[in-house]
Amino acid sequence: MDRRRAFGIVLVLVSACGFGSGGLFAHPVYEAGVGWQVLSAWRFGFGALLAWIWLLASAERRRGLGLVDRRTAVVAVALGVLYVGNSGTYYAGLETVPVGLAALIVYVYPAVVAVMTLRFGRRLDGRRPWFALGLALAGVVLALGGVPTGAMPPLSGVALIVASPLIYSVWIVLSARLSGEKRDAVGGERAEGTDAAAATALMMTGTAAVYWLSALFLGLPVTPDRIPGAAWPGLVGVGVVATFIAIQAFYAGVRRIGAAQAALVSTIEPAWTIALAALLFGQTLAPIQLAGGALIIIGVIIAQAPPEAFSSIRPGVRMADE
């Protein structure tokens, strides 16, 4: 393995662990009495600020921003607004759903995306996406079924967590169009599109604006003087590690190893979250829930693996990468 590829894998691992740490950082924030809306406002506030600093610090990235036309900029900001639906449902659900269980449920999104691309995305033929989605959903059923009756989270919290990957899947398909992906492109091919750093800064700005405006409109305690000191480490962590670093590391890793391989490497994310949730907060999963998690990850691997990986099983089936 060459050095560039190895570094790309490391970057994607860093990204997966960063994204997977979001719920872990949120836990002490909630315990300090800060709600999910305020957490999200600061999360994307920090993320957007750092994204713009990163963008403007490089002449090459500044040139990329200059090439973004008005329509593309509006679309990027609109995608940021749409991202509120995904992030909001997830972090609202985390107020009542254990972090490890939430991580398992949310990770069905790659299988959902694989099915959505049959109609709305890249060229993706055959029944494999449906099989992958079926495995992932069976895993969710096992994960929920393993919760003791007396410890079952509120249905509203579970519904919010389930809604998150569905909204995120729509967001992924739409943002792929913004990046220049063609509907008839085979997985792994990428057209020229909007500069990643510019698109990220614009999208996070849109997300941050919605959270901050809504928090101020609702009179939530979002200003620094109204936030408990115990909440700040978690707020900074979720904004820096789980947002800015995670996103930038993922883009950098994809450039080195490709989106398909990045998607497979990212399957470490739920395992990372579950392990740390057990270590830090004592939130352990039952064996049947871990079996459900294994089904979800297998479904993701089937959905995202390149076609040649299964050519001996069913020739002629093409798979797209995430």
Write out the residue ranges for each language-model feature.
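Hydrophobic transmembrane alpha-helices of multi-pass small-molecule transport proteins
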Residues: A51, M116, D125-V147, L276, ...
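Helix-helix packing/entry segments at the starts of transmembrane helices
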Residues: A16, W42, A102-V108, L174-A209, ...
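Transmembrane alpha-helices of multi-pass small-molecule transport proteins
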Residues: A26, E31-G85, P110-M116, L135, ...
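Specific alpha-helical transmembrane segments that line the substrate/conduction pathway
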Residues: V38-L49, Y83, Y90-L124, A163-S164, ...
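Loop-to-transmembrane-helix transition segments
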Residues: F7-S15, R62-T89, R128-L133, S156-S164, ...
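Glycine-/small-residue-enriched transmembrane alpha-helix faces in small-molecule transporters
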Residues: M1-W42, V81, T89, A132, ...
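Specific transmembrane alpha-helical segments of multi-pass solute transporters/efflux pumps
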Residues: G18-G23, L55-G100, V106, L142, ...
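Hydrophobic/aromatic residues within transmembrane alpha-helices
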Residues: V29, L39, R43, V77, ...
